[in-house]
UniProtKB/Swiss-Prot annotation:
Annotated residues for binding of substrate: D21, L22, N23, R37, H60, L61, G62, R63, R115, R148
Source organism (scientific name): Azoarcus sp. (strain BH72)
Intracellular or extracellular location(s): Cytoplasm
Family: Belongs to the phosphoglycerate kinase family.
Name of the featured protein: Phosphoglycerate kinase
Pathway: Carbohydrate degradation; glycolysis; pyruvate from D-glyceraldehyde 3-phosphate: step 2/5
One Pfam entry name: PGK
Subunit architecture: Monomer.
Keyword Nucleotide-binding listed: yes
A GO biological-process term: gluconeogenesis
InterPro entries referenced in this protein's UniProt entry, alphabetically: Phosphoglycerate_kinase, Phosphoglycerate_kinase_CS, Phosphoglycerate_kinase_N, Phosphoglycerate_kinase_sf
Catalysed reaction equations from the record: (2R)-3-phosphoglycerate + ATP = (2R)-3-phospho-glyceroyl phosphate + ADP
Length: 394
């Protein structure tokens, strides 16, 4: 994937429009409760300021009604936090599409919630052209919305004088390309989660590429059903057994493997007080629920991870929120942390597991995109990246 990079451009004296992802959670009083996305946007903004650009930043926040900015929709709290992180005032500009505001080189303003503009979500061409007219350089630094074709992620990239990837977006593209397009072998993928149905496309796409496909959570239970194992009252999708079998067949035909659990942790309910039992996968009773990998399985999978060249991780392998069902995910996380392989991880639950087991510094790259990360794994073209690719030459 070839795109122009912000750091390759001379932005001195230029008006730069940055589409960031500042969609952060807030409490009922409007206080930001978690600011990772704002922090992740700082390098591109700082680069432009340090190099004498006049900087405009915008983002979506929540799911507002187009044409209105309600009290829950405003980026005002984000402007305050951005100012604190940049150590300079950040003015919030409302009704900005037609221009009429001034930004000097070395200054930064925040343009109010872009999803409040009529036509944003439908990638309206007239809106995109008006926004493109505000700038000399358009920067997309919002990988989390790269799978959506909207006016600030796609349309503007077509019409701005120059369109490029920001520092965060560039790092995402480089890391994902390294993991999936030129991986060091063996390539090991870990796909956890409740349902095969929601990740079927990913599983089939990866089955054509990876050397080992580790499945966890409810997905693993469906694969166990496909392998003829009894799973008691475990979460699974019996209607997806044929699809699970197809994934295993694709892997087998390539000489690759889906290593299924040999022992599991079971209980009769999912709760913090549930009594956990470690048993062989062949001993699962009619009322048992499989809630985690057992220690033998975890050790076997940790060995696979230890010998990997590249690791792609999406989804925990057990109900890791409860300590007695966290062993599999914890051992997996530890194996990834100690592996020499290049590792990339993404998806909300995966990030929660990384935080819980304190391995953020030991994962090669942590993707900021939930849906965008999944669609990339599915092999789909992401509209925002496709728009930047189309502008690579001009």
């Amino acid at each position: 994937m070839q795109v122009k990079k912000l750091t390759d451009l001379d932005v001195r004296g230029k008006k730069v429009f940055i589409r960031a992802d500042l969609n952060v959670p807030q409490d009922e009083a409007g206080n930001i409760t978690e600011d990772t996305r704002i922090r992740a946007s700082i390098p591109s903004i700082q680069y432009c300021l340090d190099n004498g650009a006049a900087v405009m930043v915008t983002s979506h926040l929540g799911r507002p009604t187009e044409g209105e900015v309600g009290p829950d929709d405003t980026l005002a709290p984000v402007a305050v936090r951005l100012g604190q992180l940049l150590h300079k005032p950040v003015k919030l500009i409302a009704n900005w599409v037609e221009g009429g505001f001034e930004v000097k080189p070395g200054e930064v303003v925040l343009l109010e919630n872009c999803r409040c503009n009529k036509g944003e979500k439908k990638d309206n061409e007239e809106l995109a052209k008006k926004m493109a007219a505000l700038c000399d350089v358009y920067v997309n630094d919002a990988f989390g919305t790269a799978h959506r074709a909207e006016a600030t992620t796609h349309g503007i990239a077509r019409f701005a004088p120059v369109s490029c990837a920001g520092i965060l977006m560039g790092a995402e593209i480089d890391a994902l390309s390294k993991a999936l397009h030129q991986p060091a072998r063996p390539l090991v993928a870990i796909v956890g989660g409740a349902k095969v149905s929601t990740k079927l496309t990913i599983l089939k796409t990866l089955a054509d590429k990876v050397d080992q496909l580790i499945v966890g959570g409810g997905i693993a239970n469906t694969f166990l059903l496909a392998a003829g194992k009894r799973i008691g009252e475990s979460l699974a999708e019996p209607e997806m057994v044929r699809e699970a079998q197809q994934v295993m067949d694709i892997m087998k035909s390539r000489g690759a493997e889906v290593p299924l659990p040999i022992d599991v942790v079971v209980a009769d309910e999912v709760s913090a007080l549930a009594r956990a039992n470690r048993i062989s996968v062949d001993e699962v009773g009619p009322h048992d629920r499989i809630l985690d990998f057992g220690p033998k399985t975890s050790a076997k999978l940790a060995d696979i991870i230890a010998h990997a060249g590249t690791i792609v991780w999406n989804g925990p392998v057990g109900v890791f929120e409860h300590a007695q069902f966290a062993g599999g995910t914890k051992m997996m996380a530890s194996a990834i942390a100690h592996s020499e392989a290049f590792s990339i991880a993404g998806g909300g639950d995966t990030l929660a597991a990384i935080a819980k087991f304190h391995i953020a510094d030991d994962v090669g790259y942590i993707s900021t995109g939930g849906g965008a990360f999944l669609e990339f794994l599915e092999g789909k073209k992401l509209p925002a990246i496709a728009a930047l690719e189309a502008r690579y030459e001009g």
